[in-house]
Amino acid sequence: MLNDEVPDNDDYDAGRRRGEFDNITPEDFTRDHGSGRATPPGWLDGESLGRIRRQMPIAYVEIVPVRADEFGRVTQIGSLLRVCDDGSIVERTLIAGRVLYHETIREAIARNISKDLGDIALPQLPQGLMPFTVAEFFPTPGVSPYHDARQHAIALCYMVPIAGDCKPQDETLDVEWVDPRTAALDSFLEQMADGHDYIVRQALAWAGL
């Protein structure tokens, strides 16, 4: 798995078979290159992942979280506030993450939402898996509207209604919501970099807003 995650016994997909990764537990962790980051045997260490990112595209899912009314109409658009990797500033972004080895698209959507919004967010996963757009992130600025300095990533983009309570997890500092019909939306989108604002605009157009 690309994000060094070992499923806990009570995880929603803990019982799913993963072939060579079955029966790996947190006790199987090994230390890698003295970095202090734990990597299970046979999984990609940071150096290997970095090399692969420089050589081939990486599959991602990107989720635009929304609140919807009883008729399914979008009433709010959500975003995450996170500290940048270098710790310098807080950035506004969307839910995104790699599709792991031997993981379905549907499972990747559910796992990444749970990772960022918590276990009681209660996402209403789409019945079909046709994304509203496919965003190609390139490490070279200007190749497309989407930029990721680390890698060439191909992101399947989905709008997912969130019915439960959101409790920020991991690097997420807060989850903020905005009514897409108000003037606050423009300010909201201006704070998104690297093409994530364009993804939100496409999501709104897809939803008829």
Protein language model regions, located:
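Hydrophobic (often cysteine-bearing) scaffold residues that line and stabilize catalytic clefts
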Residues: 57, 101, 105, 196
